[in-house]
């Protein structure tokens, strides 16, 4: 099974991707996580990608396509995966279809701009186990202590400020809305209300994928 999660920054793709991937025992591949891993390396590619991310701009198709192809052609993903954050535009979608021939399902997370901004600006994660929290909606039960592993160290995304987030949303709309129309005609496109809480969204996705 190959499932693509589409939606703007802060729509909840990463949270649901991890949950559903664990439930159906498939890898969760998040383009943003791949980029953040690359950025930590001392390479010219890392510097180039980091410059785009810091400015709230999308990384050029040629770079994105090559990075994602290198990952997806690994034998670790031969049985399927949940793909989060790719493709982002028509050119990427057609590149993806050029080397992936299996049937796919596309799930789009629909969320208002106002809620997206709060989700992104409030987002942080446990540095140890990567559990995601939000200063507006989902804080640890005990202050500064991770609910899952007990760690007291957290990561805050440096590229997340209101100006950059708003720009990322606008860039996303310009780039990705034509892709939504393209996939709507595929017969495998599904929309979920991303404004619901985590549990409700998870249930909606399980129904789409016909899993318990």
Curated annotation (Swiss-Prot):
GO molecular function per UniProt: adenylate kinase activity; ATP binding; zinc ion binding
Residues where Zn(2+) binds: 126, 129, 146, 149
Region of interest (LID), residue spans: 122-160
Pathway in which the depicted protein is active: Purine metabolism; AMP biosynthesis via salvage pathway; AMP from ADP: step 1/1
GO annotation terms (biological process): AMP salvage
UniProt remark on domains: Consists of three domains, a large central CORE domain and two small peripheral domains, NMPbind and LID, which undergo movements during catalysis. The LID domain closes over the site of phosphoryl transfer upon ATP binding. Assembling and dissambling the active center during each catalytic cycle provides an effective means to prevent ATP hydrolysis. Some bacteria have evolved a zinc-coordinating structure that stabilizes the LID domain.
Name this protein carries in UniProt: Adenylate kinase
């Amino acid at each position: 099974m190959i499932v693509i999660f589409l939606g703007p920054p802060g729509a909840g793709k990463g949270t649901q991707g991890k949950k559903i991937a664990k439930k159906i025992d498939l890898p969760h591949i998040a383009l943003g996580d791949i980029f953040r891993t690359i950025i930590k390396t001392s390479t010219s590619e890392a510097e180039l990608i980091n410059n785009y991310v810091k400015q709230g701009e999308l990384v050029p198709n040629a770079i994105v396509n090559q990075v994602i192809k290198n990952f997806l052609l690994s034998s670790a993903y031969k049985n399927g995966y949940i793909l989060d954050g790719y493709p982002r535009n028509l050119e990427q979608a057609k590149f993806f279809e050029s080397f992936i021939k299996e049937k796919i399902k596309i799930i789009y997370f629909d969320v208002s701009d106002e809620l997206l901004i709060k989700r992104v600006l409030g987002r942080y994660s446990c540095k140890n186990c990567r559990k995601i929290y939000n200063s507006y909606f989902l804080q640890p039960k005990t202050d500064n202590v991770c609910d899952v592993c007990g760690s007291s160290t957290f990561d805050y995304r440096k590229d997340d400020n209101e100006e950059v987030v708003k720009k990322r949303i606008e860039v996303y709309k310009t780039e990705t809305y034509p892709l939504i129309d393209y996939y709507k005609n595929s017969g495998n496109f599904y929309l979920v209300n991303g404004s619901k809480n985590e549990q409700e969204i998870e249930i909606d996705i399980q129904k789409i994928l016909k899993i318990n």
